[in-house]
Design a protein with these regions (language model features):
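Cysteine-centered nucleophilic/redox motifs
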Residues: 179, 188-214, 219-220
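Short, surface-exposed beta-strand-loop junctions and turns on beta-sheet-rich folds
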Residues: 51, 183, 192, 226-227
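N-terminal low-complexity, intrinsically disordered patches enriched in charged
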Residues: 49, 197, 224-225
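Hydrophobic/aromatic-rich core segments of domains that either
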Residues: 216, 220-232
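A contiguous, well-ordered beta/alpha segment that forms the leading edge of an enzyme domain
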Residues: 3-184, 200-203, 208-209
Length: 232
């Protein structure tokens, strides 16, 4: 989700030597794929399949799923036909935004995490995090001028981080930020949520054995084809 930068895909798929039999006795082979263009991190998937053709079907589904969540949760870029986190932020103080039900689900989950962590996980911290991002990028561009943000500036931004103000309407599938200075940043939970949903999607499609890692957020499906547990 790098602002102003093109994303690129590195998909490396190969059958590894390890293989095994499923519970039905079907010979299964582990296939791998790695990507660099989702969530600004390394994504790797290992899926046991009967053959390469079956793996390609699962891989295509995984790519479509990761692309969907990458675009929905992006705070920097717009995508044709997609109302994402950036769309919500751009309409702060203007109007509710109709979004994909998955965004409603993510934001409702974020409220649960907010309560569970006593407010330490707060997706409404976008106004503060954007300042840190701005200073970090400036420091990377010119290390000799790197500095931390002014405390007063951060404190002012912190006045616009009340998660309770975020208006979520599940029935209408809309999200609205009434405070025009507020913005959402779901980076703290997006990758974990997307990894979990990816696992659920692949399992529903018939995958019985897989290891999925999205930036270190790991989910497994079943065991290895030989019955041994995945080592994470």
């Amino acid at each position: 989700m790098n602002h102003g930068k093109k994303t690129f895909l590195l998909a490396l798929a190969s059958a590894v030597v390890l293989s095994g039999c499923s519970g039905s006795g079907q010979q299964m082979t582990a296939y791998d794929a790695q990507y660099l263009d989702y969530f600004d991190t390394v994504t790797s998937i290992t899926i046991y399949a009967k053959n390469e053709a079956e793996f390609e079907q699962y891989k295509s589904l995984a790519e479509d799923t990761m692309k969907k969540y990458h675009e929905l949760f992006d705070i920097y870029d717009n995508y044709d036909g997609v109302s994402n986190i950036k769309t919500i932020n751009d309409n702060a103080g203007i109007a509710p935004v109709t979004v994909d039900p998955e965004l409603i689900s993510l934001l409702e989950f974020s409220r649960q995490e907010y309560e569970k962590t006593g407010g330490r996980v707060n997706v409404a911290m976008g106004s503060v995090l954007s300042i840190w991002h701005e200073y970090r990028e400036a420091g990377l561009k010119d290390p000799s001028r790197a500095q931390i943000p002014d405390m007063q500036k951060l404190q002012q931004a912190a006045q616009h981080t009340d998660l309770e103000q975020v208006q979520i309407d599940p029935q209408a599938s809309t999200v609205y930020l009434p405070d025009q200075e507020m913005s959402l940043d779901v980076g703290a939970i997006a990758k974990g949520y997307a990894t979990k949903r990816l696992a659920e999607t692949l399992e529903e499609a018939g995958v019985t054995s897989a290891l999925l890692s999205l930036g270190g957020n790991v989910e497994t499906i079943g065991t290895k084809a030989d019955g041994k547990p995945w080592r994470v």
